[in-house]
Amino acid sequence: MIVDLSHVLQTGIQIYPGDPEVEIKEALNVEKDFVNVLTVNMGSQSGTHVVSPFHVFADGKKLSEVELSHFVGTGVVIDATGLSDRQEIPTDRFVSTDVNGASIALVRTDWSQYFGSDKYLAHPFPNIESLEYLKSKGITTIALDFLSLDRTPGAGEDFTLANHYFWSQGDGIIGENFTNLKAISVARPHISMLPLNLGASDGAPVRAIASW
C-alpha cells in the first residue's frame, strides 16, 4: 500500500505569508515546439516540503549536506486531532505515543483539510517539552500536516521561531504542509520524503509517501 502525503504544487497554492508566490505556466507546447515544458517559479519552501537547519542558522547544514537517512525511515503518527484554532498541542499527545523504533514523527491534526483557507494559518502547534521528548526517543525528523512548527501569529501576536531553533539543532529536519495522514492505517509505516537536490538550500518541495 502506498499513500501520497503531498499537496499538488500548482499556481496560487497557499504559502507561508511573505514567501514567494508559486507560478507554474506553459513554456513550450507540442503544437508549436514539439514538446511540453513548464516554467516553474516558487520559493524553496512551497507546498509539501522539508526544512534544513540552514533555514534558521547561518552556519546550519544546507539541504544538500544533510544525510539522506533523515528523509526516509520508519514513521509513527502522533494523534493531535480535535484541537482548536492556535491551540498548543498538549504534551501528553506526544508522551502517550509509543515512538520506539521510529525515526520520523508525523504529527496529525487534520488541519490539512483547511489548506488554501485563512483558517489554515490558525493551526495548532507543539511546545518545546514535546519536541524534547521526541528527540530523547531518537526522532530525527518531524513532519506536520499544518503550516509551521511554530505558531503562525495572528493579528497583534508576536512572531517566534523558538521551535524551529530547538529542532534544527543537531541536524533535525522539519517537514511541513503534509496531508492525508489519516490514511495511514499501520503503526510503523515506511516514510519517504526525499527533497529536490537543491544546492545551498534552506529547504525544498518533496513528494512524501507512506508505504507498508
Give the ranges of each region predicted by the language model:
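Active-/binding-site microenvironments in catalytic and ligand-binding cores
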Residues: M1-W212
